[in-house]
């Protein structure tokens, strides 16, 4: 009985540690041609080939960027950012570069 309680206690502590580990990878979106993927990781937007490889960071602001969405032609990426205090919509070239603010929230 004592062995069972120790096993259960260890299992519960392992599970609770896993449950509070933050999931930094989110907002995954596949390009219209299916060749590339954009995603958010720790508040920045990254792009990677769908076939695999090293991800390229597209944003590097102190702000939090999220919800990247491809334009229908795959040439631009729209996303939300709190660069100016509140979340606004921005658009940038799919290969990175200067983002243009679309809304003034």
Regions found by a protein language model. Give the residues of each.
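Positively charged n-region of N-terminal signal peptides that target proteins for export
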Residues: 1-4
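N-terminal signal peptide c-region/cleavage motif recognized by signal peptidases
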Residues: 14-16
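Sequence signature of WD/YWTD-type beta-propeller architectures
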Residues: 18-105
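Sec-dependent N-terminal signal peptides
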Residues: 6-11
């Amino acid at each position: 009985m004592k062995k069972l309680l120790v096993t259960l206690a260890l299992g519960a502590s392992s599970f609770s540690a896993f449950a509070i580990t933050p999931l930094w990878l989110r907002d995954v979106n596949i390009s219209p041609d299916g060749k590339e993927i954009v995603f958010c990781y720790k508040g920045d937007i990254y792009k990677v080939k769908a076939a695999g490889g090293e991800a390229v960071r597209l944003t590097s602001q102190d702000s939090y960027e999220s919800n990247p969405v491809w334009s229908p032609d795959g040439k631009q990426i729209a996303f939300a950012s709190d660069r100016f205090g509140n979340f606004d919509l921005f658009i940038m070239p799919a290969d990175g570069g200067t983002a243009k603010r679309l809304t003034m929230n």
